[in-house]
């Protein structure tokens, strides 16, 4: 079973609140999950300590077990000082290079 560490949306309309969960890759975004490993509240100030809260020990356990974090969650994990597996780091670097390499729509029209 492929497992991912991803965000599950909660909160009210126009007031998002996310749980960082470990879930089966094929499960719906807000559906069943295996474990809740943290929270993300985008409504708080960016410098707030409570904006992203992660259970470091459980995140490390799931990463060692082979769970793949989504792009956003991988950034949260790095900011929290938790070591990501080398494979995940390389995938993130490749995605960043691909995003930078694409020309904008204006540049594409001019060429």
Swiss-Prot record:
Record's GO cellular component terms: cytoplasm; small ribosomal subunit
Record keyword Repressor present: no
Pfam families: Ribosomal_S16 (PF00886)
Gene Ontology molecular-function annotations: structural constituent of ribosome
Ligase found in the keyword field: no
PROSITE patterns: RIBOSOMAL_S16 (PS00732)
GO biological process, one term: translation
Keywords: Ribonucleoprotein, Ribosomal protein
NCBIfam families in UniProt: S16
Matches recorded under PANTHER family: 30S RIBOSOMAL PROTEIN S16, SMALL RIBOSOMAL SUBUNIT PROTEIN BS16M
Family in the record: Belongs to the bacterial ribosomal protein bS16 family.
Protein name per Swiss-Prot or TrEMBL: Small ribosomal subunit protein bS16
Protein species of origin: Rickettsia bellii (strain OSU 85-389)
